Amino acid sequence: STHTAYATETFLDVLATEAKQDPVAWRLKMLDKHPRHAAVLALVADKAGWSKPLAKGKKGERRGRGVALHESFGTVVAQVAEVTVARDGSFHVDRVVAAVDCGVAINPDNVRAQVEGSVGFALSAALHGEITLKDGVVEQGNFGEYAPIRIQEMPKVEVHIVASANKPSGIGEPAVPPLAPAVANALAAATGRRAWRLPLQTEQFKA
């Protein structure tokens, strides 16, 4: 699901760019027969201020905003990521806005906590989750070589739950798949460069 989401949501952004279409509007056009997905996407766009200009960074910095939408475990999640990219290609994910339709949210605080945790987990994979082999053996043996994100890498996360009367659906993992494509799409918006492999590397985005 995570790999599928990255492939489909980054490619949709490529198509939107080639068609000179807004990425959110482009997706909404294709969701006319999927009102649940459209509602989640519209909510995240509204809460993220998608239609408003993104605040400029410091001199030499490039900023971008990206979106992704995905369904897994019966739950629909849309995310908007905002990034700041330095001249040397290093970048920071500043903010992630998420909208989630998981049916009836029996415990809204738990839903928010799960989404926040999923963003952290997914960002770790997107930035640091590379597995390499040497002589048929995985080289990463501990957290020193396979690092989770540090607290300074964690973005501000906002979670918005769609009011629903439908039966509850999964919330443990559905916010993981859209994160990497949302960040990659934001980086493309900021730099004009597409990341065709994960994890996302500084070298890909140098000015």
Model-derived features: positions:
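Cofactor-binding beta-sheet edge motifs in enzyme active sites
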Residues: 1-207
